[in-house]
């Protein structure tokens, strides 16, 4: 169980936000991504996975 809580996900913003829906822009900001090619290492949780699924076409995920 302790190993599961330490899992992280790397998320990279690979497409610009111009033309994206405002809700999707907010989801990208919530992930901590600001500029193109920004990378964040986030804790793997259902909340983070939901945000990633919302903007799957804007980001690239590395396990």
Swiss-Prot record:
Presence of the UniProt keyword NADP in the record: no
GO cellular component: cytosolic large ribosomal subunit
GO molecular function, one term: structural constituent of ribosome
The keyword Ribonucleoprotein belongs to this UniProt entry's keyword annotation: yes
A Pfam family: Ribosomal_L30
Superkingdom per UniProt: Bacteria
Coiled coil: none
GO process terms (BP): translation
Keywords for this protein: Ribonucleoprotein, Ribosomal protein
Similarity field: Belongs to the universal ribosomal protein uL30 family.
Subunit description: Part of the 50S ribosomal subunit.
Protein name listed in UniProt: Large ribosomal subunit protein uL30
Organism listed in the record: Stenotrophomonas maltophilia (strain R551-3)
Gene for this chain: rpmD
């Amino acid at each position: 169980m302790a190993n599961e809580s330490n899992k992280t996900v790397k998320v990279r913003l690979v497409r610009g936000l111009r033309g994206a829906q405002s809700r999707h822009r907010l989801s990208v900001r919530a992930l901590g991504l600001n500029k193109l090619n920004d990378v964040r290492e986030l804790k793997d949780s259902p909340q983070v996975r939901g945000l990633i699924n919302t903007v799957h076409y804007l980001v690239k995920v590395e396990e």
